[in-house]
Regions:
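Transmembrane-helix signature of polytopic, membrane-embedded enzymes
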Residues: 4-9, 78, 99-121
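Transmembrane signal-anchor helices characteristic of membrane glycosylation enzymes that use polyprenol
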Residues: 5-30, 38
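Membrane-embedded helix bundles of polyisoprenyl
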Residues: 9-14, 87-90, 111-125, 136-140
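Transmembrane-helix motifs of polytopic, lipid-linked glycan transferases
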Residues: 11, 83-106
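Membrane-proximal lumenal/periplasmic loop motifs of glycosylation machinery
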Residues: 22-28, 46-69
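Hydrophobic core segments of transmembrane alpha-helices in multi-pass, intramembrane catalytic enzymes
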Residues: 33, 39, 92, 138-139
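Loop-to-helix entry region of an early transmembrane alpha helix in multi-pass inner-membrane enzymes
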Residues: 58, 62, 66, 76-94, ...
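Hydrophobic transmembrane alpha-helices
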Residues: 68, 72, 96-104, 123-126
Length: 140
């Protein structure tokens, strides 16, 4: 496959994933995740003075929650869910590119491209790319 065709394929894959991230809608726990991010950001900015207990704080990355909350606050409130999906998509695509580069270093260029395509088209991973912020960051 020529580099022009590869770039075109990559462009359409990225556009398709952005389209899916924007049209997927709100999941049942996204408001809770934003609230966790708000509480964690208050904790970090107060240097530990505001310490509210958050369920599962020790199991998942509270830094990611606060970063996600901070970035979604940049956008208007009616677009916070879509902004969160784009942020999750960015980290998920980073995982895909990272695993592709890692397998390219371990094996060869063909295996790296194959791993990239398999992971991108794997339905469970692709379905969770935009809405699941817990598992994708652990894969990173």
């Amino acid at each position: 496959m020529t580099p022009t065709k590869q770039t075109t394929l990559l462009f359409f894959l990225l556009i398709f994933s952005i389209y899916c991230a924007l049209t997927i809608g709100q999941s049942w726990d996204e408001e809770t995740e934003l609230l966790r991010g708000k509480i964690t950001l208050e904790y970090l900015l107060s240097l530990g003075d505001v310490d509210k207990k958050i369920l599962y704080r020790e199991y998942y990355s509270p830094i990611y929650w606060s970063l996600s909350y901070l970035l979604t606050k940049i956008f208007p409130s009616q677009f916070q869910i879509e902004a969160g999906h784009i942020i999750n998509l960015f980290f998920s695509l980073s995982v895909i590119f990272g695993i592709g580069k890692f397998s390219k270093e371990l094996f060869n260029k063909k295996v790296g491209k194959l791993c990239f395509l398999i992971l991108f088209f794997y339905p469970i991973f692709f379905g969770h790319m935009a809405m699941n912020n817990k598992d994708m960051i652990l894969a990173l």
